[in-house]
């Protein structure tokens, strides 16, 4: 430690140096505490340690602008689920009526918990491991669980990007390769591929040409080399986007976050001009109010809110940790949440405008096929021509005319009617067909685009949008893995990031087998749902009940410069934990009531069949959930019995129990005890104080406090005035 003038004079005169703590700090020249050497209390022989400043933020990267940060949060939270899951849930759960429970739960669960993660990340300026270690060391396992969940999600999520890459490259041809069934040679006769003839061209292309899928999860079938190459491309894209941290990913976000909105806007305009688009939108938003009383609707709405904002992954915390301390994260939480909701509604409009068009196409096809059946029955005298209304013209048969004719035949030929095999061809039935996930993106949407003018252009735009949506979410997911590990273990950023991508690619080969789609279903449905719910409820408890909601609100007031709404106090303290507990219980009950299974594509039947997971797959599923949640009890037990150090003796800064921030500027000037904290290891460490008045960077030399009348400073020594980062 650099010597002040008094100490220098006494050392030159060989006098015995005795300084109080206050004198040493008050007369100190500017100092760089990162190289200070302290004697730590409780260590035998006065062993010296280099106190590396754990919460140093001098070298921490920062966002180039507020816009870049907001786009990163939007890119992470707005993902493929907004495009293919929210519209499905909206249709399934009452149309416009579903928006009511969704909005209510967004306000009482989504925004408060999103704000909580933004606040702790911004204040403590560490990834998920460091943040929860500082808030409550015994719950430090939360951060490790978040990393594991991010790894599980990243493994299969990038496979979906790989699928989109495959379709993207296949879109540069006319006609689109999934617009017609392939023709095969059977000797000298050309016939349509039977599997395609029984299903549809787009369904066949997805299951056979793209996935080359096996009949069950137990039939591996070997690697699909086309998807293996696409997965390699996907991980290469992600690796290049995140290898330099936010310096590289931040720039990528300008395109990956904004481009999907351009595409959605173009699709909406084009979709509204399609015949039948209004039918789809009206069907979508026609409220079925009785659905609002169904508990299942509220459970699914809560789950969607929960995952739509990316809570519990650690990506939100990682991104906010690169913010300035005085950033208004209160505003950010509301802004990102409502942009997310707006995106979901926009995507729903686009999806059902397109599906309304598709429903009209399919309904007209149904009318033509059944009209041909009726003509056959008329020609064979199975039906009398007297049953056909006189104004019906088979050459220009409308949907209305067919419905009238169908009703007459069904009434007159009541007993023989089932044997005729006629369909009602109702538009409502087509619109009611629930489509979600890969079925929406790679079957329903691709089929609709085959009927678009200039279909290759729209196909390229659509799959490029999916790639960008997936990339934005993957950047946040990778940040949830790399940021806490790099912060905690100080590993080289570039090397660790590249290593993660290479490791994930090789593990991801599991998902590009012929049975890989079934593993994607398993990971998507079960590997993250329950663990993330547990993670977020423990985050809420750690801040609201262990640290204390009142103290947390005080810290936010100091950090933001204004007091957040009292609304958040009650949400964090009571409402959100209760809702999360109910959601966790409901998820566990759902697992027990409905045995886990998957939809398998049976080649011989050219149809899907729901199968239950075999015993080994159930064991894998349970292992995934256990591995994701195991760090929480393990770290708790190890720290409870003092088998794992909380690292307090290696920190240059220790913290009073139950305080995240300590501003010493308001303390009494002559109170020397203000520089000495409790020897009890911190239960809630915190970042550096907001206001620092007199110390700045400078040269250092070792500080030997063995002659100090107060004894060794111990682990409670407070670096009250280390310069605050410009971040």
Swiss-Prot record:
Task: Give a yes or no for keyword Transmembrane helix in this entry.
Answer: yes
What family does the database annotate? Belongs to the sodium:neurotransmitter symporter (SNF) (TC 2.A.22) family.
Please describe the organ and tissue distribution of this protein's expression: Expressed in the brain. The strongest expression levels in embryonic, postnatal, and adult stages are found in both cortical and hippocampal tissues.
Q: Compositional bias (Polar residues) at which positions?
A: 698-710
Annotated source species: Mus musculus (Mouse)
Phosphoserine sites (modified residues): 13, 20, 665, 701
Q: What is the lineage of its organism?
A: Eukaryota, Metazoa, Chordata, Craniata, Vertebrata
Topology in the lipid bilayer:
Multi-pass membrane protein
Gene Ontology MF term list: symporter activity
Record Pfam families: SNF (PF00209)
| Reaction equation(s) it catalyzes | L-proline(in) + Na(+)(in) = L-proline(out) + Na(+)(out); L-leucine(in) + Na(+)(in) = L-leucine(out) + Na(+)(out); glycine(in) + Na(+)(in) = glycine(out) + Na(+)(out); L-alanine(in) + Na(+)(in) = L-alanine(out) + Na(+)(out)
Q: What is this protein called?
A: Sodium-dependent neutral amino acid transporter SLC6A17
Q: Which residues lie on this side of the membrane: Extracellular?
A: 90-96, 162-224, 270-304, 356-451, 514-528, 592-618
- Cross-referenced InterPro entries, in alphabetical order? Na/ntran_symport (IPR000175), Neutral_aa_SLC6 (IPR002438), SNS_sf (IPR037272)
Question: What does this chain do?
Answer: Synaptic vesicle transporter with apparent selectivity for neutral amino acids. The transport is sodium-coupled but chloride-independent, likely driven by the proton electrochemical gradient generated by vacuolar H(+)-ATPase in an overall electrogenic mechanism. May contribute to the synaptic uptake of neurotransmitter precursors in a process coupled in part to vesicle exocytosis.
Q: Which residues carry this modification: Phosphotyrosine?
A: 377
User: Which residues bear sugar attachments?
Assistant: 186, 393
GO cellular component, alphabetical, reads: cell projection; GABA-ergic synapse; glutamatergic synapse; plasma membrane; postsynapse; synaptic vesicle; synaptic vesicle membrane
Cytoplasmic face: residue ranges?
A: 1-68, 117-140, 244-251, 323-333, 472-494, 550-569, 642-727
**Residue stretches spanning the membrane:** 69-89, 97-116, 141-161, 225-243, 252-269, 305-322, 334-355, 452-471, 495-513, 529-549, 570-591, 619-641
Q: Where in the cell is it found?
A: Cytoplasmic vesicle, Secretory vesicle, Synaptic vesicle membrane; Postsynapse; Presynapse
What PROSITE patterns does its record include? NA_NEUROTRAN_SYMP_1, NA_NEUROTRAN_SYMP_2, NA_NEUROTRAN_SYMP_3
Q: Assign the protein's first listed, main location to one coarse class.
A: membrane
Region annotation (Disordered) maps to: 680-727
Check the record and name the PANTHER family matching this protein: SODIUM-DEPENDENT NEUTRAL AMINO ACID TRANSPORTER SLC6A17, SODIUM/CHLORIDE DEPENDENT TRANSPORTER
- Keywords per UniProt: Amino-acid transport, Cell projection, Cytoplasmic vesicle, Glycoprotein, Ion transport, Membrane, Neurotransmitter transport, Phosphoprotein, Sodium, Sodium transport, Symport, Synapse, Transmembrane, Transmembrane helix, Transport
